[in-house]
């Protein structure tokens, strides 16, 4: 009998855009849902406790001033065999890194950290929101045990908030490895990367440190494969 993979979707401090991105896969979503058992997703059904699961997709950053948020993050790590940071907020901090507090009569500065800095995360899918193809690709690779495909996402999970457009500059452009394909610019959700003379230029004031560009860059994602082709 084939074991059904149990998957949980956990939402922390986020806008739910990552889950919407997953829904945008349309017919592919049906293939994914037919391959798994969705055991937890408060956006779709009310549930009090996170059950034990094989894969936990965690969306959103962790509010360090909210004990509940911290407890949920720790509970996910205990209950899930594989924890996936879904989207920029969970993977690198994203736009929540720029939070300056609310608009109450006594403004309080709320501190947010990516999930990768609070608990041990196995995989991180960047992007704000992550592309539907990336989400389905990671879930499918995890179901099939394709570690080669998952390697860039595992590395991003270890880097945490360090991921940003500077990765492309330091790791690729400055080492004369850039092919000028423009994949990094196409992957950027805020248009913080522009191509000048066939090379990417990062506009730091627009970069939200989502990590999408570095994971999509073929030089970073498939370095050995590119070397073989050349």
From Swiss-Prot:
The keyword Repeat applies. InterPro entries: 4Fe4S_Fe-S-bd, 4Fe4S_Fe_S_CS, Coenz_F420_hydrogenase_gsu, Hydrogenase_assoc-protein, NADH_UbQ_OxRdtase-like_20kDa, NiFe_Hase_small_N_sf. Pfam families: Fer4_10 (PF13237), Oxidored_q6 (PF01058). [4Fe-4S] cluster 1 binds at residues 178, 181, 184, 217. Its EC number is 1.12.98.1. [4Fe-4S] cluster 2 binds at residues 188, 207, 210, 213. Residues 169-197, 198-228 form the 4Fe-4S ferredoxin-type domain. It catalyses: oxidized coenzyme F420-(gamma-L-Glu)(n) + H2 + H(+) = reduced coenzyme F420-(gamma-L-Glu)(n). SUPFAM superfamilies: HydA/Nqo6-like (SSF56770). It is an enzyme of class 1 (oxidoreductase). Keywords: 4Fe-4S, Electron transport, Iron, Iron-sulfur, Metal-binding, Oxidoreductase, Repeat, Transport. GO terms for molecular function: 4 iron, 4 sulfur cluster binding; coenzyme F420 hydrogenase activity; flavin adenine dinucleotide binding; nickel cation binding. Reduces the physiological low-potential two-electron acceptor coenzyme F420, and the artificial one-electron acceptor methylviologen. NCBIfam families: FrhG. Belongs to the FrhG family. Heterocomplex of the form (alpha(1)beta(1)gamma(1))(8). This is Coenzyme F420 hydrogenase subunit gamma. It comes from Methanocaldococcus jannaschii (strain ATCC 43067 / DSM 2661 / JAL-1 / JCM 10045 / NBRC 100440) (Methanococcus jannaschii). The lineage of its organism: Archaea, Methanobacteriati, Methanobacteriota, Methanomada group, Methanococci.
